[in-house]
Amino acid sequence: MIIDVNSPLPGESINRAAPWTSYNSDYLIRVFGIIENFKGFPNTLGFFAANEVMNDLDTAEFNPQYIRAVQRDLKNYIAKHSTRTIPVGYSAADVREILQDTWAYMQCAHEDDHSSSDFFGLNSYVQADSSIALETYAYHICLM
């Protein structure tokens, strides 16, 4: 399992419109609780620090540093409270105008920097109607 530590309920995820309003101690207590509940299962492969927080140019302006801060906090918590290393990453929306920059920023690492993504997920949605060619949906571009 790769578990998203966030939920759609108010206060339980990064607010993409104003991330500074949601990244607080209550939020961290909640996400650390998710780690506590799943860290002991051998089939826990990783944790998503955030999922589709950036979905356009406007949300890509302020959110990246908050996502990396959550990744750092999760990794530090896991290092102190788990008997094993559990990877932490980001799950991105398939928004082509920001996708490459998002990937580059999330995976960029420096010495002693624990905020980079261990993995990068991509949510690519396709409406599959078998009577219509996949090229109509541009899905063939994702496969390249």
Predicted regions and their residues:
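Acidic (Asp/Glu)-rich catalytic clusters
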Residues: 1-2, 33-43, 106-115
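Hydrophobic faces of well-ordered beta-strands that scaffold small-molecule active sites
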Residues: 1-5, 45-49, 88-90, 118-122
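Active-site-adjacent "subsite" loops/lids of carbohydrate-active enzymes
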Residues: 7-36
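Eukaryotic short linear interaction motifs
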Residues: 9-18, 43, 55-57, 96-99, ...
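Extracytoplasmic/periplasmic, Sec-exported soluble proteins
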Residues: 19-26, 39, 59-66
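Solvent-exposed, polar/charged alpha-helical surfaces in well-ordered, non-transmembrane soluble domains
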Residues: 29-36, 42, 68-72, 76
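Active-site groove signature of glycoside hydrolases
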Residues: 32-62, 89-91
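Noncatalytic carbohydrate-binding groove/subsite architecture in carbohydrate-active enzymes
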Residues: 59-144
